[in-house]
């Protein structure tokens, strides 16, 4: 597959980006001047790859930059059937982490109780919602009454414990 020139439309900002700055993960540390690795949605401007044409929308590990030239094989077309942001959230790093952590690592089942730390965060919020869809009782842990209210009322968790509430034993 040939090279493709793209213009970035949306980038994903994930908790992993902070860890990548420190080099404490499966990737080497991001150095000054490096492009921050990240999933991104981009528009194809020019293509030497027969599978991609100018105007196509694509997803890939493009990073935090306005434009890039990269192998077409590193990109996948984005279909028009869902909002573009879904490719960076539900289908991005946070969504994949939530899905694999809950179903492959934890193996949650209907009727079980699931405790989710960082329940208001990108991964925790998805873990809790997936747990509810699976039929689990979901208890979130978050910092502050506003976050706990959002976790319960908007995300649908059964309960939320405020770790900042000093009145709790």
Locate predicted features:
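Adenosine-nucleotide cofactor-binding segment
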Residues: 132-169
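NAD(P)H dinucleotide-binding glycine-rich loop of Rossmann-like/cofactor-binding domains
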Residues: 36-43, 54-118
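Residue-level detector of flexible, active-site-proximal loop/helix-junction positions
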Residues: 51, 74, 82, 145, ...
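Alpha-helix termination/capping residues and helix-transition junctions
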Residues: 49, 107-108, 154
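Active-site-facing substrate-recognition patch
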Residues: 16
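N-terminal Rossmann-fold NAD(P) dinucleotide-binding loop
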Residues: 124-125
């Amino acid at each position: 597959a040939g090279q493709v020139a793209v213009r970035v439309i949306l980038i994903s900002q994930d908790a992993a980006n902070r860890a990548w700055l420190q080099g404490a993960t499966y990737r080497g540390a991001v150095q000054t001047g490096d492009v921050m690795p990240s999933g991104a949605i981009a528009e194809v401007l020019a293509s030497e790859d027969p599978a991609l044409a100018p105007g196509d929308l694509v997803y890939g590990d493009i990073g935090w930059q306005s434009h890039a030239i990269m192998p077409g094989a590193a990109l996948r077309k984005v279909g028009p059937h869902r909002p573009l942001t879904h490719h960076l959230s539900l289908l991005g790093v946070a969504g994949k982490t939530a899905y694999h952590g809950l179903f492959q690592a934890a193996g949650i089942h209907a009727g079980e109780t699931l405790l989710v730390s960082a329940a208001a965060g990108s991964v925790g919020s998805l873990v809790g919602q997936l747990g509810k869809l699976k039929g689990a009782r979901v208890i979130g842990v978050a910092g502050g009454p506003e976050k706990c209210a959002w976790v319960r009322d908007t995300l649908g968790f059964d309960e939320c414990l405020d770790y900042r509430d000093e009145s709790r034993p």
